[in-house]
Amino acid sequence: VIDLYQIHWSNRSVPIAETLGAMEELVDRGMVRYIGVSNFSVAEMREAQQAMTKNPLVSNQVLYNLKRREIERDLIPYCADNDITVIAYTPLADGSLAGRSRLLPDKRGAVLEQVAQESGKTQAQVALNWCLSRPNVIVIPKTNNVERTVENCEASGWSLSSEQVTMLDAAFPI
């Protein structure tokens, strides 16, 4: 059984009702537990929800990190209001939020480093924890390194202070 089956991108050449109808049929057959989408706007999620007759839309996998916060304007609030989990891909901004200072040489990197030092955590852990502090947001950081996997897992189970969140929000505005 597939736990979560997602549409990766909206496909305007195939009606969303047809696609989601087929996905709901897979749920009915016991082959899939939950249906989600990826890279859908709020309007596309509304259309998807209207097309679904038997199952809720449970997730939207989207680009989200400290550097790319545009979805906070409408998508995150909509998902929170509709019990849809946001699955943040590229939460470390291709490594630039993981302590690679050459990729983040401005004051933002200094703020991230300061918060990491204050917290006794790595910059990557701070960046991931910041994402996790948002409503209905989980992260899927990419790595092929066992040590980084452990480090990423240690981004949960603790919280940034409200002052630290404010510092990060100011350094990385929407």
Where are these regions (language model features)?
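Beta/alpha (TIM)-barrel catalytic core signal, keyed to glycine-rich beta->alpha loops juxtaposed to Asp/Glu
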Residues: S10-I174
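Specific alpha-helical transmembrane segments that line the substrate/conduction pathway
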Residues: L4-W9
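A glycine-rich helix->loop->beta "capping" turn
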Residues: V1-D3, G36
